[in-house]
Amino acid sequence: MAKLNPFEISQKQLDICADILNLDSGTHAILRVPMRELHVSIPIRMDDGTIKVFQGFRVQYNDVKGPTKGGIRFHPDETIDTVRALAAWMTWKCALVDIPLGGGKGGIICNPKELSQGELERLSRTYIDKVFQFIGPDQDIPAPDVYTTPQIMSWMMDEYSKIAGKNQFGVITGKPMCIGGSVGRTDATARGGWYCVREAAKEFGIDLKGATVAIQGYGNAGYYAALLGQTIFGSTIVAVSDSKGGIYNAAGLDAQAVYEHKAKTGSVIDFPGSEPITNEDLLELDVDVLVPAALEHVITGENAAKIRAKIVAEVANGPTTPDADDILHENGIHVIPDFLCNAGGVTVSYFEMVQNFNRYCWTEEEVHERLDERMTAAYHATLRGSKKYDVNMRRSAYVVAIERVVEAMETRGWV
C-alpha cells in the first residue's frame, strides 16, 4: 500500500470526526479542502549574479473564525500537500484553544543552509512581494516555522510595511522584541504543554513534585520542558536525549547544566554523572511523564506496548502513529495530543498580535496567566469530549475543534 501523504492523512482524520459528529455532506465537503491557496514563482538574483527561481506556497484553509494564522517553512522537500495539511491542522489547533483565528501555512522549496544571508533576505522579501495581496493583519498572519527565524520575520514584516506605505507590525508574529515581539514566546510551547500535564496529573492523582520525567529531544522545546518541569513544578528529570543519544540519572539531571554542556560539546551525551541511554530505551522508561519533543513517528505499533509512562505529553508534532495511539489508549496511558500539547506557541503568537494592535506590551506574568487560562480550558474541553464520545484524547481534540468551526460556519450562514 502506498504511503499516505500528509494531506490525505488530515482528510482521513476529518472523515472520522465527521462521522462522530454526524456532519451533513455539504459541511463535510467544505472542510475537506482549503478555502484558498496561492502558488508563486520567486526569482532571486544569487550572489554569483545568476537568477534562480524558487517555488513558494501560501494556503489559507478556513477563516470562518477569523484571519488565518500559520508559519512559513523553508525546506528543500516542501510540498503543497504538506502545506495544505499543516494549514488544516492549524485551523483545528486555533479552534481548540479558542482563539479567533483560522488556519494557514506557507512554504518555499529551498535549502536555507545553502543560501547566504543576502540571498535569504532577498528570498524572504520577494516572497512577501508575491503574496502581499493575500496576507495582512486582518487577513492572514504568518509566523516562523521550519528553518525560518525572527530575523526572517523582521525582513518580511519590513517588506510588507514598505509596500503598504506604513508600519504593519501585526502582519507577522515571532518577531524580535525590539520591533513588536512578545515576552513569553520563547518557552511558550513547552510552558503550554506543562499546563496540560499539570491538569492531567490532577485528573490521575499524580503529584508533579518529585514526579519522574523523560524527555526525548533537547532543542528549544525539550530544553524548556526540562527547565520548567524542574524549576516550576519540582519534577525530577531523569533522562533527556538528542539526535546523538541520551543520558540517564535516576536522582535527576540539572536541566540548565545539561543545556550548557550541549552548547559546549554539541550534544547531551557524556554529561558528567549520567549514564548513557538510547533514544529507544528512553521512550520505554518507567516514568510518570514522557515528553516526546523531537521527531515524528517515534512511538509506533512496534514499541507502544512497551511504553510505561503514565502521561505522554506530545510537545513534538506527530510523535505517535495511529496504531500506537490505539495501543496506548487500550493500556490506559493518557496521551496529551500534539496539537493540544504544543498549542502554547500559536496562543502566544496570538497574544503578540493583540499587543501589536493595541500598541500595549503585556508583562511576562500577564502572558503566562493568559496562556495558562487558554491551555487549561482547552485541556478540559478535550477531556470532556473524550468521555462524552468515548474516544481517545487525540480524536476528542479534533472533534472539539471541528465542532467549534462548524458552529461558526452555521452561525455565519455558510452552511
Task: Give the ranges of each region predicted by the language model.
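Glycine/serine-rich phosphate-binding loop and adjoining beta1-alpha1 elements at the start
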Residues: 75, 95-208
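Short, Gly/Pro- and small/polar-rich lid/capping loops
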Residues: 2-41
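Glycine-rich phosphate/diphosphate-binding loop of Rossmann-like nucleotide-binding domains
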Residues: 176, 181-284
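Flexible, glycine/charged-enriched surface loops at secondary-structure junctions
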Residues: 24-30, 98, 135-144, 167-170, ...
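Glycine-rich, N-terminal phosphate-binding loop and its surrounding beta-alpha-beta segment
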Residues: 40-112
